[in-house]
UniProtKB/Swiss-Prot annotation:
Region (Interaction with EZR) residue spans: 575-589
Protein family: Belongs to the monovalent cation:proton antiporter 1 (CPA1) transporter (TC 2.A.36) family.
Ranges of the Extracellular topological domain: 30-50, 102-110, 168-180, 237-243, 304-305, 359-366, 426-432
Main location: membrane
Basic residues biased stretches: 676-692
Modified residues (Phosphoserine): 554, 562, 592, 607, 663, 719, 813, 816
Native source organism of the sequence: Oryctolagus cuniculus
Stated name of the protein: Sodium/hydrogen exchanger 3
Origin: domain of life: Eukaryota
Tissue expression notes: Intestinal and kidney specific. Most abundant in kidney cortex, followed equally by ileum and ascending colon, then kidney medulla and jejunum. Is absent from duodenum and descending colon.
Catalytic activity: Na(+)(in) + H(+)(out) = Na(+)(out) + H(+)(in)
Length: 832
C-alpha cells in the first residue's frame, strides 16, 4: 500500500508537468495578445519568453529525477527491468503526450546537447573512478577488441547490407556502397553509456566488465575516424576518391587517437599541478577538477581529435595525484557531484531517446533493411569476439572462457552515440537519412531493452563468475605485492619485457619524479606503504580489543592489564559479601560507576568496582583522543572549518607511531650484549671518555628547561611545513584539557598513546648505567652522543622484554602507578 501511495503523487506531478509543457506555445501566444491589448503600467507581468529555456531545462531535469524515484519504489521492477529500458519507455510515453498536446515533437535529443553537455560527465566519471591496474593489465585485449573489432563490425555490416541490396530484396533505395559503409561505421560502435547502464546492474566479474567497458570507451577513436572518412568520401563522391585519401584516413586514425590521448594526459598533468597549491583555497578545489577536465574535452573537439579519449585519460591519469592533494571534504564533493552529474545525464539521454522516437517526420520504414541490420549486427559481433578471443587466449595468462565470450557478444549494446552520429548526417548528401535514423533507433531500442532484459537471466543461467564487493585483507595485499615483485624479477632475469616489468619500472619512475612534482610532500609520506601497513595493523589491534570486550560483555580487556592470561579473567560482576549486600551498598556501587572524581575515590575505601573505575579512567585517559573545547567559526565563503575527524586520525596515528618507534629503538639499543664484549673493556672506556667529553661537565643537562617538553612535541614529522600550521594552530586555539604529563627528569615512564604490543613492554626499569654502555653496532673507536629523548628518559632494556604474551594493553600509564599499593588489596577474580 505504501508503494502505491508513493507512486500516485509522483505520476500526478509528472502528468501535470507534461501537460504544462504541451500548452507552452498556446500560453506564449496568449501572453503576446494580452500584451498588445493592455496599455499602461502593470504591477505584475507574465514574462514566459524571458525564462522559457532555463525553465524548460529545469522541468525536464526534475521530471527525470522524479522518474528515478518512482522506478526504485518497487525493487521487484528494477531487479528485472534495467533502468535504461524503463527510461526509454517513459520517454516514449511522455513524447506521445507532448505530441498529442502540441501536435509536433517539441523536444528531441540534438547532437550538440548530447556531445557537449550530456556525454562529458558520464565519460569523466568512468575515467576518474577507473580501476587503473585492472584497466592497464588488460589494455592489450581492450585495444584489440576496440580497434580490430570495430573495424570488423563496420566493414562486415556495411558490405553485407550492400550485397543484399544488390540482390534486390530491399527494393529501390538511393544508396551506394559508401553510404552503406558510412552506416556500418556509426552502427558498429559499442556505446559506453548503454554498457555502463546495463553491466553495472548485472555485476559480472571485474575482468569481463573492464574489457567490455574499456572497448566501449576506446573504440571512440575508430568510430570517429571511420565516420569522418566515409562522410567525406560520400561528400566527394565515389569517383573522386583516390588511394591517397585512403592512406590519409589510416593516418588520421593514429593522429585522432594518439592526439586525443596526449591532450588528456597534458590536462591531467596541469590539473594535478594546480591542486598541489590549493591548500589555502580548499573551497574551489572541486571546481578545478571539473573545469580542467571539461577543457580537455573541448580542446580535443576544437582540434578534431577524440574528445572521449581525451577526457577519459584525463580522469585516469590525474586521479592518483588529485585524490592525494585535495582535502577530504573536497574529495567527497568531487565524488558525489561527479556521480550526480553522470547519473542525471544518463537519465536524460535515455528518456530523450524515447521522446525523440515519437517524431513522425524522421520515420522511414523498410522491413528488410531493419531486420537484416539487426541480424548482421548481432551475428558479426559474435563472430568477431570468438575470432579475437581465440587469438588472445594464446598469449593471455588468464583465459577468456566460452561463457565469457557469450556475455561479451551479447553485451555489445548500441546507444545514444549512434543516434547522435546518424542525426548529424547531411540529408542533402545522404538521400536515405531517415531510413538510417529509423533503423538506428530500432537497433538501440532492441539492444538496450531486449538484450538488457535478458542479459541478467543469461548470466545467471550460464553461472558467470560475479564480482565480489569486499575490501581485500592485509594478508592478501601483502601476498599480491610479493607476487608482483617475484614476477617482475623473473621477467627481468629472463630478459622478457612483460606487463609486470613495465609496471615495476613505471612505479619507480612515478615515485622518483612524478610524485615529487605533482604531489605534496605530506601526501607522499602519508601514502607510504609501510606507514599504511602499520596503520592497518594498529587499527586491527584496536578492533580486536574492542571485539573481545564486547564478546565478554564488559570492559574487562582494560580491567586487569597485569594479568598474564586473559582467558582466566572473570568478566562477570563480583559478588558482594554478606556485609556489603545491602541496599545502601548497591546504591553506592551504582553511583561510583559514573563517578569520575578520582580524589573522592582515593580518599574513601574503594571496592572492586571503584578499583575498576580508576583503571578504566586512567586507561581511557591515556589511549583515547584528547577532548578539546569546541569553538565556532565565523561564516566565510572562502574558508571551510577544519575537519575534526581528519585531525583526530592524524594525531592518533602520529602519537601511536611515535610510541611504536620508541619501542623499536629501545629494542635495537640493547640487542644482546655480546659475550666477547668483556675483551674490549679498554676500548669501551676510551669511547666513554670521548662521549663524556662531548657532554658539558660529563653530566646530562637534565635540569635544562629545554627538555621539559610535552608529549605533543613533533618528533615524527609526517607533514611538510605547509601542512603543519593548520594542525597545530587548531590545537592551540582549542585550548583543550591536557591529559598527558610533561616529560621532565622526575618522569620515569613515557605516556604511550595508542595500542601497544606486549612484546615491547618491559617488566622493570633500566639501570641508569645504560648510557655508559656502547651499542653493539659501533666500532671500538666510535662514540655517539645521546639524543634529547635518551637524556630525558632512559631506553628500555632488551633483556627484560617479556616473551610473546597474550594480546593486551600496555600498563605503562603514568597514572596507573597510583594503584600499585592497592594491587594486593583488591585482587581480580579469576576462574579456577
Amino acid at each position: 500500500m505504501s508503494g502505491r501511495g508513493g507512486c500516485g503523487p509522483c505520476w500526478g506531478l509528472l502528468l501535470a508537468l507534461v501537460l504544462a509543457l504541451g500548452a507552452l506555445p498556446w500560453t506564449q501566444g496568449a501572453e503576446q495578445e494580452h500584451h498588445d491589448e493592455i496599455q499602461g503600467f502593470q504591477i505584475v507581468t507574465f514574462k514566459w519568453h524571458h525564462v522559457q529555456d532555463p525553465y524548460i531545462i529545469a522541468l525536464w531535469v526534475l521530471v527525470a529525477s522524479l522518474a528515478k524515484i518512482v522506478f526504485h519504489l518497487s525493487h521487484k521492477v528494477t531487479s528485472v527491468v534495467p533502468e535504461s529500458a524503463l527510461l526509454i519507455v517513459l520517454g516514449l510515453v511522455l513524447g506521445g503526450i507532448v505530441l498529442a498536446a502540441d501536435h509536433i515533437a517539441s523536444f528531441t535529443l540534438t547532437p550538440t546537447v548530447f556531445f557537449f553537455y550530456l556525454l562529458p560527465p558520464i565519460v569523466l566519471d568512468a575515467g576518474y573512478f577507473m580501476p587503473n591496474r585492472l584497466f592497464f593489465s588488460n589494455l592489450g585485449s581492450i585495444l584489440l577488441y576496440a580497434v580490430v573489432g570495430t573495424v570488423w563490425n563496420a566493414a562486415t555490416t556495411g558490405l553485407s547490407l550492400y550485397g543484399v541490396f544488390l540482390s534486390g530484396i530491399m527494393g529501390e533505395l538511393k544508396i551506394g556502397l559508401l553510404d552503406f559503409l558510412l552506416f556500418g561505421s556509426l552502427i558498429a560502435a559499442v556505446d559506453p553509456v548503454a554498457v555502463l547502464a546495463v553491466f553495472e546492474e548485472v555485476h559480472v566479474n571485474e575482468v569481463l566488465f573492464i574489457i567490455v567497458f574499456g572497448e566501449s570507451l576506446l573504440n571512440d577513436a575508430v568510430t570517429v575516424v571511420l565516420y569522418n572518412v566515409f562522410q567525406s568520401f560520400v561528400t566527394l563522391g565515389g569517383d573522386k576518391v583516390t588511394g591517397v585519401d585512403c592512406v590519409k584516413g589510416i593516418v588520421s586514425f593514429f593522429v585522432v587517437s594518439l592526439g586525443g590521448t596526449l591532450v588528456g594526459v597534458v590536462f591531467a598533468f596541469l590539473l594535478s599541478l594546480v591542486t598541489r597549491f590549493t591548500k589555502h583555497v580548499r573551497v574551489i578545489e572541486p571546481g578545478f577538477v571539473f573545469i580542467i577536465s571539461y577543457l580537455s574535452y573541448l580542446t580535443s573537439e576544437m582540434l578534431s581529435l577524440s574528445s572521449i579519449l581525451a577526457i577519459t585519460f584525463c580522469g585516469i591519469c590525474c586521479q592518483k595525484y588529485v585524490k592525494a592533494n585535495i582535502s577530504e571534504q573536497s574529495a567527497t564533493t568531487v565524488r558525489y557531484t561527479m556521480k550526480m552529474l553522470a547519473s542525471g545525464a544518463e537519465t536524460i539521454i535515455f528518456m530523450f531517446l524515447g521522446i525523440s522516437a515519437v517524431d513522425p517526420l524522421i520515420w522511414t520504414w523498410n522491413t528488410a533493411f531493419v531486420l537484416l541490420t539487426l541480424l548482421f549486427v548481432s551475428v558479426f559481433r559474435a563472430i568477431g569476439v570468438v575470432l579475437q578471443t581465440w587469438l588472445l587466449n594464446r598469449y593471455r595468462m588468464v583465459q577468456l572462457e566460452l561463457i565469457d565470450q557469450v556475455v561479451m557478444s551479447y553485451g555489445g549494446l548500441r546507444g545514444a552515440v549512434a543516434f547522435a552520429l546518424v542525426a548529424l548526417l547531411d540529408g542533402n548528401k545522404v538521400k536515405e537519412k531517415n531510413l538510417f535514423v529509423s533503423t538506428t533507433i530500432i537497433v538501440v531500442f532492441f539492444t538496450v531493452i531486449f538484450q538488457g532484459l535478458t542479459i541478467k537471466p543469461l548470466v545467471q543461467w550460464l553461472k558467470v563468475k560475479r564480482s565480489e564487493h569486499r575490501e581485500p585483507k592485509l594478508n592478501e595485499k601483502l601476498h599480491g605485492r610479493a607476487f608482483d615483485h617475484i614476477l617482475s624479477a623473473i621477467e627481468d632475469i629472463s630478459g622478457q619485457i612483460g606487463h609486470n616489468y613495465l609496471r615495476d619500472k613505471w612505479a619507480n619512475f612515478d615515485r622518483r619524479f612524478l610524485s615529487k612534482l605533482l604531489m605534496r610532500q605530506s601526501a607522499q609520506k602519508s601514502r607510504d606503504r609501510i606507514l599504511n601497513v602499520f596503520h592497518e595493523l594498529n587499527l586491527k589491534d584496536a578492533i580486536s580489543y574492542v571485539t573481545e570486550g564486547e564478546r565478554r560483555g564488559s570492559l574487562a580487556f582494560i580491567r586487569s592489564p597485569s594479568t598474564d592470561n586473559m582467558v582466566n579473567v572473570d568478566f562477570s560482576t563480583p559478588r558482594p559479601s554478606t556485609v556489603e549486600a545491602s541496599v545502601s551498598y548497591l546504591l553506592r556501587e551504582s553511583a561510583s560507576a559514573v563517578c569520575l572524581d578520582m580524589q573522592s575515590l582515593e580518599q574513601r575505601r574503594r571496592s572492586v568496582r571503584d578499583a575498576e573505575d580508576v583503571i578504566t579512567h586512567h586507561t581511557l585517559q591515556q589511549y583515547l583522543y584528547k577532548p578539546r573545547q569546541e569553538y565556532k567559526h565565523l561564516y566565510s565563503r572562502h574558508v571551510l572549518s577544519p575537519s575534526e575527524d581528519e585531525k583526530q586520525d592524524k594525531e592518533i596515528f602520529h602519537r601511536t607511531m611515535r610510541k611504536r618507534l620508541e619501542s623499536f629503538k629501545s629494542a635495537k639499543l640493547g640487542l644482546g650484549q655480546s659475550k666477547k664484549a668483556t675483551k674490549h673493556k679498554r676500548e669501551r672506556e676510551r669511547a666513554q671518555k670521548r662521549r663524556n667529553s662531548s657532554v658539558p661537565n660529563g653530566k646530562l643537562p637534565l635540569d635544562s628547561p629545554a627538555y621539559g617538553l610535552t608529549l605533543k612535541e613533533r618528533e615524527l614529522e609526517l607533514s611538510d611545513p605547509e601542512e603543519a600550521p593548520d594542525y597545530y594552530e587548531a590545537e592551540k586555539m582549542s585550548g583543550g584539557i591536557e591529559f598527558l604529563a610533561s616529560v621532565t627528569k622526575d618522569t620515569t615512564s613515557d605516556s604511550p598513546a595508542g595500542i601497544d604490543n606486549p612484546v615491547f613492554s618491559p617488566d622493570e626499569d633500566l639501570a641508569p648505567s645504560l648510557l655508559a654502555r656502547v651499542p653493539p653496532w659501533l666500532s671500538p673507536g666510535e662514540a655517539v652522543v645521546p639524543s634529547q629523548r635518551a637524556r630525558v628518559q632512559i631506553p628500555y632494556s632488551p633483556g627484560n622484554f617479556r616473551r610473546l604474551a597474550p594480546f593486551r594493553l600496555s600498563n605503562k600509564s603514568v597514572d596507573s602507578f597510583l594503584l600499585a599499593e592497592d594491587g594486593a588489596e583488591h585482587p581480580e577474580s579469576t576462574h579456577m
